[in-house]
């Protein structure tokens, strides 16, 4: 099969628009349009599944507490038992990005006397950033002497403690369940959108929540790259690597040009011109967004003016009620 012109005639988004006024380090919303019917749903579903399962993150993978041999122990001077401490540690969200992605890091902690052990205590150097520093880990009294090592690793998805037992080398090390994924929730919606006179294209709106260790924008980019790399194996022909020139759709350009014109260029009657002026409609793009009902509700708008405007708009391939363009 020839690779030439495979995408000819396909409507594709030229860029992704992130809604900057609502985006935060933990939340992002973006819109991509137009897609051919069915493709918006396919891409939205694929991105969602990949985001939820395949984005790398960091988590605590194992702990070793001095004087403790198993997770069903108690520690003198600590209110919580080891099982509760482990449950709390599983909730710690960490940003850890070593140059060697395979490298793990061991944190050594010594906590003595009365106080609270919080997630912030794990940020022992600049390579570790805790995204939920106020998370409570344990309560210590004046007799406490908590000495522990915690191993941090990078990975994907969820890895149960059972799968790590075979890799334990140091006696007394307790593996714990690791939730590596930095993605907390992903939602997407596909709606209809208009291109020129056709309204059967798709608009993809996606919302992404993360723990803050990766931005929603970067997470979406990583998911797209993962999908692209997996799909490459299905291409059974050589692709020419060349810089793509952005193709300007002639119909789209004509529509944009028409909508940006001043209503005076319609050469309307004095009566119709005065009505548009009273409604503060200066450009054709503003005019076509109005419905016929909205126009006829105007005090001085007559049936004759409506017919005149409809005829002028029709001659340009436009009509009332064009809200999506």
UniProtKB/Swiss-Prot annotation:
DNA-dependent RNA polymerase catalyzes the transcription of DNA into RNA using the four ribonucleoside triphosphates as substrates. InterPro entries: DNA-dir_RNA_pol_insert (IPR011262), DNA-dir_RNA_pol_RpoA/D/Rpb3 (IPR011263), DNA-dir_RpoA (IPR011773), RBP11-like (IPR036603), RNAP_asu_C (IPR011260), RNApol_insert_sf (IPR036643). GO terms for cellular component: cytoplasm; DNA-directed RNA polymerase complex. The N-terminal domain is essential for RNAP assembly and basal transcription, whereas the C-terminal domain is involved in interaction with transcriptional regulators and with upstream promoter elements. Residues 1-238 are annotated as: Alpha N-terminal domain (alpha-NTD). CDD domains: RNAP_alpha_NTD. Residues 255-325 are annotated as: Alpha C-terminal domain (alpha-CTD). Homodimer. The RNAP catalytic core consists of 2 alpha, 1 beta, 1 beta' and 1 omega subunit. When a sigma factor is associated with the core the holoenzyme is formed, which can initiate transcription. Keywords: DNA-directed RNA polymerase, Nucleotidyltransferase, Transcription, Transferase. It catalyses: RNA(n) + a ribonucleoside 5'-triphosphate = RNA(n+1) + diphosphate. It comes from the Bacteria. One of its GO terms (biological process) is DNA-templated transcription. Its EC number is 2.7.7.6. Pfam families: RNA_pol_A_bac (PF01000), RNA_pol_A_CTD (PF03118), RNA_pol_L (PF01193). GO terms for molecular function: DNA binding; DNA-directed RNA polymerase activity; protein dimerization activity. Belongs to the RNA polymerase alpha chain family. This is DNA-directed RNA polymerase subunit alpha. It is an enzyme of class 2 (transferase).
């Amino acid at each position: 099969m020839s690779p030439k012109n495979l995408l000819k005639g396909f409507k594709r988004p030229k860029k992704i628009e992130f809604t900057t006024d609502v985006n935060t380090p933990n939340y992002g919303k973006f819109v991509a349009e137009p897609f051919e019917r069915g493709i918006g749903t396919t891409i939205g579903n694929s991105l969602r599944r990949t985001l939820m399962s395949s984005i790398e993150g960091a988590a605590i993978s194992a702990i070793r507490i001095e004087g403790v041999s198993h997770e069903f122990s108690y520690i003198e001077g600590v209110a919580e038992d080891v099982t509760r401490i482990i449950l709390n540690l599983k909730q710690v969200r960490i940003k850890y990005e070593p140059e060697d992605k395979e490298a793990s890091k061991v944190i050594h902690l010594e906590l003595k006397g009365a106080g609270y052990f919080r997630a912030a205590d794990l940020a022992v150097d600049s390579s570790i950033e805790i995204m939920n520093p106020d998370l409570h880990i344990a309560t210590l009294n004046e007799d406490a002497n908590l000495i522990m090592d915690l191993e941090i690793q990078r990975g994907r998805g969820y890895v149960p403690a059972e799968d790590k037992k075979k890799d334990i080398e140091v006696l007394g090390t307790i593996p714990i369940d690791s939730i590596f994924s930095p993605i907390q929730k992903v939602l997407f919606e596909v709606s209809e959108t208009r291109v020129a006179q056709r309204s059967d294209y798709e608009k993809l709106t996606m919302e992404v929540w993360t723990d803050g260790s990766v931005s929603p924008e970067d997470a979406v980019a990583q998911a797209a790259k993962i999908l692209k790399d997996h799909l490459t194996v299905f291409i059974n022909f050589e692709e020419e690597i060349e810089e793509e020139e952005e193709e300007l759709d002639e119909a789209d350009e004509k529509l944009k040009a028409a909508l940006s014109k001043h209503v005076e260029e319609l050469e309307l009657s004095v009566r119709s011109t005065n009505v548009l002026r009273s409604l503060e409609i200066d450009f054709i793009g503003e005019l076509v967004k109005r419905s016929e009902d909205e126009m006829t509700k105007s005090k001085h708008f007559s049936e004759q003016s409506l017919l005149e405007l409809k005829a002028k708009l029709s001659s340009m391939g436009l009509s009332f009620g064009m809200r999506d363009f």
